[in-house]
């Protein structure tokens, strides 16, 4: 009888620990409270104007597209931001040479440059359940324009040819069909990669990217939860 009671006590403690673990894990993937985010954004940036409609449309997309296949989610998100935003240089939009805007800032402006498109698509797909290891924000050289450029790449598996989500074109194509892009480095919430690194090995973490860290801080100020890995 004593052994039976000891067993039940252990199982109760195990169950409590499991429940607490699930609660903590749920906290790490907390819901995005768009009412609070809009209030915070207005306090930080002033009246949202037409940006509120774009933010509402983004919220609707995130709430309704999770049932799609991953490739379908790529297409929906890619088309959404390519249509909701117009291209504008940082110096004209933010009076800075290189500024990484949050998705909220980009939607308020209805504009951004290449990294702003890639960043907004990355966070959207992460929110829609695409694992971070399948997504990389990739810095490339656009050979036709002879300039730096940034895109989002998607790997269906670690050895797959990535698909490229680009602000320059709506079509999502394999990297093998984008000879106009020369990759330089890539990153996500978990690491940093250099083009040509053997075995796709990470060469560091995103703590080395000060603009990425600043971006996460801005998103937290806007009301997004502080998640350990985006």
Task: Describe each model-derived feature in a short phrase.
Residues 3-16:
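Bacterial N-terminal signal peptides that target proteins for export
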Residues 6, 23-25, 29-30:
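Intrinsic disorder/low-complexity segments in short proteins, especially the signal peptide
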